[in-house]
């Protein structure tokens, strides 16, 4: 499965548009990790814990996106948009959502 943020794939003509596909992942934030991430942010370092959670959520969302596309018989997803939002009480959770158009290409 190929993923692209562009509307086309160079050298691979799109022969069929299969439909819009999406993937979402919502992960809760840990209060202790939040506390230490806040301290690290104060002293100017990067928050490895948050970066790891973002990466994990993005991987889950893309896996869902690919599974939906495959179920439609597609071999690629183009025009992908990636969004990040905080949700829940006191913005205690992180949501990553991805969407795009599932397509069949001529290879």
From Swiss-Prot:
It holds the Pfam family YbjQ_1. NCBIfam families: PRK02877.1 (NF002776). Belongs to the UPF0145 family. This is UPF0145 protein Ent638_1382. It comes from Enterobacter sp. (strain 638).
């Amino acid at each position: 499965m190929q993923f692209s943020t562009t509307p086309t794939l160079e050298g691979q003509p799109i022969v069929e548009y299969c439909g819009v596909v999406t993937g979402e992942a919502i992960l809760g934030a840990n209060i202790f990790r939040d506390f230490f991430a806040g301290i690290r942010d104060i002293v100017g370092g990067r928050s490895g814990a948050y970066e790891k959670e973002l990466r994990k959520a993005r991987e889950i969302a893309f896996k869902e996106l690919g599974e939906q596309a495959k179920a439609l018989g597609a071999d690629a997803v183009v025009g992908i948009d990636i969004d990040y939002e905080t949700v829940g009480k006191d913005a205690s959770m992180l949501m990553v959502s991805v969407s795009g158009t599932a397509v069949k290409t001529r290879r």
